UniProtKB/Swiss-Prot annotation:
Keywords: ATP-binding, Cytoplasm, DNA replication, DNA-binding, Lipid-binding, Nucleotide-binding. GO terms for molecular function: ATP binding; ATP hydrolysis activity; DNA replication origin binding; lipid binding. Residues 1-71 are annotated as: Domain I, interacts with DnaA modulators. Belongs to the DnaA family. This is Chromosomal replication initiator protein DnaA. Residues 71-143 are annotated as: Domain II. It is found in: Cytoplasm. Plays an essential role in the initiation and regulation of chromosomal replication. ATP-DnaA binds to the origin of replication (oriC) to initiate formation of the DNA replication initiation complex once per cell cycle. Binds the DnaA box (a 9 base pair repeat at the origin) and separates the double-stranded (ds)DNA. Forms a right-handed helical filament on oriC DNA; dsDNA binds to the exterior of the filament while single-stranded (ss)DNA is stabiized in the filament's interior. CDD domains: AAA, Bac_DnaA_C.
Amino acid sequence: MTDLSAFWPQCLARFEAELSAQQFNTWIKPLVCVAGEDAIALYAANRFSLGFVKERFLSRIETFAEDILGRPVTIELRIGGAQAGASAPAAASPRSPGRPAPAPVAATPTTGSLADSIVSDVPLPNVKLTAPKPAIGGGHESTRLNPAFTFESLVTGKGNQLARAAALQIADNPGDSTYNPFFVYGGVGLGKTHLIQAIGNHVYQKNPQAKIRYIHAERYVADIMRAYQHKAFDEFKRYYHSLDLLLIDDIQFFAGKNRTMEEFFYAFNALLEGGKQVIMTCDSYPKQIEGMDERLISRFSWGLTVEIQPPELEMRVAILMKKAEADNLKLGNDVAFFIAQNVRSNVRELEGALKRVVAYSRFSNQPISLDLVKEALKDILAAGNRQISVDNIQKTVADYYKIKLSDMHSKKRSRDIARPRQVAMALAKELTSMSLPNIGDAFGGRDHTTVLHACKTIAEMRESDPDISRDYAALQQMLRN
């Protein structure tokens, strides 16, 4: 059983692993800890800090204390620095004659070391132990989830409907081997983070006691490095191996980092063996991640892998209307349709375009109209018109499939030529404003019905053929960026 005086350094290590550096340094690190025989006092610098710690972190501190010490312990929050911490308990519980009162030492703000914070063994009054009271929002704070990312606020369309359906199943039944791990991939700004955090928020809502952690892959790497530097790696492993739900964003950042991949391999195995849920996002299909450990790539495919594709026109309009509604904006259908037609790449850029329009409207003191939108987004519209042309599409597709550019205009009908040509026609219909006859002319003088047939064929194949679906999405991303 751990002595009370050893509690605070271990508690600090756990908080540093859980919280952002700003949260840790602002609220937890400045606390002064005084350990007694049956209780622990934590001193905050002022009433505001005390109130915030009590509301957000007290229940977590109590949980850590019981976990570290092996028994429930009363945690008292008080106002005052080291001097108050040394004197207050003494007044309530006299010491033996001649025994000096050791002064508590606060965490040294200059070094940042986990071992910098120590506690004193000043006796505290024997206080009747009471069950810890849950702090409002304290548990959710430690998850690092954005409470705004919910299933209700997620717009659904063809591009993400499969991923959303799977996410709902996982949110209701985390740990189900059918969906474990859950691997979501797709281009930037398509809502992968929103989707997986919606799972986390749903699970937390159903079970606030669940140990949930959302973390970006780069932060996970930094946490590993810090754990090594502070010789707190056992604590790091114990924390991550004990989670009920782990959500890691942009896991492609692990590639080439051998130590990180090794440690994640063990954490991954520990969680799945314990029936816990692992959820990851990535910018590419697992087998296409260069520099990733083959053992991890194999394990990524154990559960369910789904792709999120760029939103189609109807979904883009719905996203804009929902965003406008959330911000109490009046947005006409014609305006939403125009923005959605011209900003096709991803959700992030779509919302960014709307913010620009709103800002332009406010600065110019004009209502949002089609003319105002065209003026506000003129550089985006010009860039889009410059970048996406049939010539550009043909060259990009030819390079991607490693065929000659001339094959786009030829009469060759072999599958390895015809299929890329059909893909290029479908992309031309989606990404340009050209008519079907004009697209046909650009592909060697073909009839508009040939273009229509190509578009229909590719649309059907994207539903049934994962390879075509991946190729098409990759080409969309290349052309839009």
